[in-house]
């Protein structure tokens, strides 16, 4: 199985390589190439087998091919075209420049250096030769100029001499022809019959000229009119034999070519009308192409703007959209309904332009059909008039010959008379039958059909190309919308994730803040409790200090009192001692 897959892959690569190298348009047109390779290019082409199966297999034509073509155009071809555009873009942006730089740097530069050396070494040599060649041509021209002038002078003199001789010969020939013609026409009594009516002349003057020349040739076989008049032993029917032959041939020829004359006049009329009509239609088709091209450019521009960027206006807070390059501001945000409306607008304009061309075709075809019917009716009337005149006039001529023959009591003329009348009746019936055929004749409008086929092919090609391009653009738009929607969905999901993360962060911060506040509150409570305890301690210490102070003051007062008492006692003691020393009695208080 693996070998089979490798074999198929190798065979496919080999076939496509041969097709790429040999099966191009130039190679196919070259008849000197190998027949087997041309056959290979033909039989390896999928379009050949597709056309072959469409032509020879009804089931493939009606069932398989439409479904396969529709699915291919819908699911495969747009992606192939997009891949080709991407590959061409890669080639133009990177590969082409890289290849050109490589070729220019590695090969062209070397060849240019070698060529410059060759040019410098041979330039002087070729310059000398070109100067010598110019001098030689100039000398040759001077030598041949006089020789050519002499030849022209001799040739002009010879031409003038020959022209004079030819003019004299032509005048003599014209005189002889006029003399012979007048002699022949005066020798016959049926000149009116041989001269065609104006109606028959308008159908085809060439047939009359042929018939007249044939009559003159028949007259020439009799040498002169004198010989005809010197044969009294011939009957009237025998004398009118040449006239009968000429008349039968004229009527038979013109009758047989009546339909051909009609087709020829219609063809000339169509060729005359189709040329300006073709110019008008070409202008309409070119206008049609330009309109479609403008609509396609508008659609392509909007499809390219699907892949856009957005920003928020800092002043208004409005979302502003920019093209992919980020420089051009978009008038609106490109949506699927908007692109669908553009596709519908293109289809409606395409249909309107196509209807305009179709209406023009229909009106012009109706006008041409009306004029062709008039030409047909005119030809029928002309043929009827010509047939009536030719039949009636010749019947009178035959009746006159019949009377003259009866006057001479010629019994031998009865068989000739029967034969000529039988041929006359047969030809009359043929003229009537051809008239009926001319009335029912289906006019050939080959130029018109060919022109309409070309126009239809042109319109079909435009329609096909436009539909294929619309399919490609529709697929491209769908891909861009899918990519943008996927990107927007990812951005939306990313925003949701970021928003969720932000909310979680805010919630976490809030929780941390609450915890910190609670901690701060606890710390504040602890601090307050410490402050209260410290205050109570300080108050207690102050109270204790106050009590100690009071105790100290009381102690000091007690000490002061004791000191005061001691002092007083000391004073009393001193007074006592002083009194004792002075021998005075103690004070009364002390005595008490």
UniProtKB/Swiss-Prot annotation:
<keyword id="KW-0732">Signal</keyword>
<feature type="coiled-coil region">
    <location>
        <begin position="448"/>
        <end position="583"/>
    </location>
</feature>
<keyword id="KW-0175">Coiled coil</keyword>
<feature type="region of interest" description="Disordered">
    <location>
        <begin position="507"/>
        <end position="592"/>
    </location>
</feature>
<feature type="compositionally biased region" description="Basic and acidic residues">
    <location>
        <begin position="507"/>
        <end position="580"/>
    </location>
</feature>
<comment type="subunit">
    <text>Component of the mitochondria-localized RNase mitochondrial RNA-processing (RNase MRP) composed of one single RNA encoded by the NME1 gene and at least 31 proteins. Absent in the nucleus-localized RNase MRP (NuMRP).</text>
</comment>
<dbReference type="GO" id="GO:1990904">
    <property type="term" value="C:ribonucleoprotein complex"/>
</dbReference>
<protein>
    <recommendedName>
        <fullName>Outer spore wall assembly protein SHE10</fullName>
    </recommendedName>
</protein>
<keyword id="KW-0749">Sporulation</keyword>
<dbReference type="GO" id="GO:0030435">
    <property type="term" value="P:sporulation resulting in formation of a cellular spore"/>
</dbReference>
<feature type="coiled-coil region">
    <location>
        <begin position="354"/>
        <end position="385"/>
    </location>
</feature>
<keyword id="KW-0687">Ribonucleoprotein</keyword>
<comment type="function">
    <text>Involved in spore wall assembly. May be a component of the mitochondrial RNase MRP (MtMRP), a ribonucleoprotein endoribonuclease involved in the cleaving RNA transcripts to generate primers for DNA replication in mitochondria.</text>
</comment>
<comment type="similarity">
    <text>Belongs to the SHE10 family.</text>
</comment>
<feature type="signal peptide">
    <location>
        <begin position="1"/>
        <end position="23"/>
    </location>
</feature>
<dbReference type="GO" id="GO:0005739">
    <property type="term" value="C:mitochondrion"/>
</dbReference>
<keyword id="KW-0496">Mitochondrion</keyword>
